Amino acid sequence: MARHLLLFDIGNTNVKVGIATEGTVLTSYALPTDGTQTGDGFGLALLDIMRHAGLGADDIDACVGSSVVPSLDPLLRHACERFLWRPLQLAHVDLPVPLENRYERPTEVGADRLVAAFAARRLYPDARALVSVDFGTATTFDCVDGDAYLGGLICPGVLSSAGALSSRTAKLPRVSLEVSEDMPVVGRSTTTSLNHGFIFGFAALAEGVTARLRKVLPEPLEVVATGGFARAVARVSDCFDHVRPDLLLEGLRLLYLESEQR
């Protein structure tokens, strides 16, 4: 029987829960990052997720996560231990990320950024340099040269920017972020103008930043897009070599497997 891993990307907007085998991430689910949730509430939600996937607690070999919300860590640890009988192993805390961290203050780097950079390094070994572009709550660019994490850039995120615009403008509709293959650059209504502004605006952000990074990072260099809006932006931009929406979950899977071999 295949070994299954339960993977957690604990972010500011959602807790992304992935189910993986040793070879691949099979599927993922999103739970809201809810400050009122309890450990038992998370545990019951995890059982529902596994039931939907046709799995039980006995099918899970390990729970592995990455967190940028420290207040949720003890709740999810409780959920895993009580309901799945497995400890939650957190990247950068319980599982070191095997990259040389060249940040001026290494502890300032979010575990999510390190794990995504590590995943890109392992998935694309032929590239000397890699840039991971994560379209999450923030839009982050993380750079790797060989086995060294160099740092990167943190820019506004798609959802946070859309939410800020909607909350400060009385007459503007909410942004839908819908993408079609033949969408024109120029919107002809307020709704399409907003939608196209965000899609093409963030595509231009990615193109501009990656073009600058290509001037300072060694070749061969490959750019990997990830996060919830990676596919939408990639449909209107050719600056990405790869699109891996579950890059961080893949990184957690690989991190755990490497730790088992040490």
UniProtKB/Swiss-Prot annotation:
MF GO annotations: ATP binding; metal ion binding; pantothenate kinase activity
Pathway membership, UniProt: Cofactor biosynthesis; coenzyme A biosynthesis; CoA from (R)-pantothenate: step 1/5
BP terms from Gene Ontology: coenzyme A biosynthetic process
Cofactor note: A monovalent cation. Ammonium or potassium.
Localisation per UniProt entry: Cytoplasm
Pfam family, one: Pan_kinase
Protein residues bound to substrate: 103, 110-113, 190
Reaction catalysed by this enzyme: (R)-pantothenate + ATP = (R)-4'-phosphopantothenate + ADP + H(+)
Top-rank taxon: Bacteria
Chain sites annotated for binding ATP: 9-16, 137
Gene Ontology, cellular component aspect: cytoplasm
Cofactors that this protein relies on: NH4(+); K(+)
Role according to the record: Catalyzes the phosphorylation of pantothenate (Pan), the first step in CoA biosynthesis.
Stated family: Belongs to the type III pantothenate kinase family.
Protein name in UniProt: Type III pantothenate kinase
Species per Swiss-Prot/TrEMBL record: Nitratidesulfovibrio vulgaris (strain ATCC 29579 / DSM 644 / CCUG 34227 / NCIMB 8303 / VKM B-1760 / Hildenborough)
